[in-house]
């Protein structure tokens, strides 16, 4: 939030932090509700339950989603604008998921996938790749291969480097770089 406030230092970030806390609480409650309905303690079922809870709350109840229509709009990379508009870039939406997951003690990492930022959620030895831009859907190897080919051409194949974890700093830098690129395109930076 502090990075987003750089464009408007007088802007109060408290309502944004409060909203993130509310979303975190709702995800935590949804996990509890889904857990009570499920008797399966298998790690695979647990990770799917967590994914379902996040999908129900973040893109479901709060309606956060990718902005495919105005993808290059600078507002899609400004975290406060993303929260206001409920639309954003994959990396901006990923920050929301990461914050919520960490508040709920869920193991999640950003994945610096070529051309499209993703998330990896882990629980009980099971993993899921999540696309925050498209409603938090999970992507299997076939979908990841298709996504890679869309960005790198038909000859591209999945490599271990495509699953490279992005540090919190790398995620923030990627978001800031998106803002910079969009500002340059608009002629705001020389």
Each predicted region: which residue ranges?
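A structural boundary/capping signal
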Residues: 1-190
């Amino acid at each position: 939030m502090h990075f987003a406030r750089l464009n408007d230092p007088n802007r109060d970030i408290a309502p944004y932090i409060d909203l993130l806390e509310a979303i975190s609480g709702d995800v935590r409650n949804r996990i509890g509700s889904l857990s009570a309905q499920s008797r399966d303690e298998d790690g695979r079922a647990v990770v799917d339950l967590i994914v379902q809870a996040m999908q129900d709350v973040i893109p479901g109840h709060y309606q956060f989603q990718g902005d495919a229509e105005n993808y290059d709009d600078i507002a899609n990379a400004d975290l406060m604008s993303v929260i206001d508009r409920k639309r954003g870039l994959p990396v901006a939406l990923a920050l929301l998921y990461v914050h919520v997951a960490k508040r709920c003690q869920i193991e999640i990492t950003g994945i610096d996938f070529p051309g499209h930022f993703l998330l990896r959620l882990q629980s009980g030895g099971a993993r899921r790749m999540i696309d925050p831009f498209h409603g938090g859907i999970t992507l299997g190897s076939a979908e990841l291969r298709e996504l890679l080919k869309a960005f790198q051409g038909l000859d591209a194949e999945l490599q271990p480097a495509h699953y490279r974890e992005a540090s919190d700093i790398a995620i923030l830098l990627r978001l800031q770089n998106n803002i910079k690129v969009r500002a340059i395109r608009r002629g705001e930076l020389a």
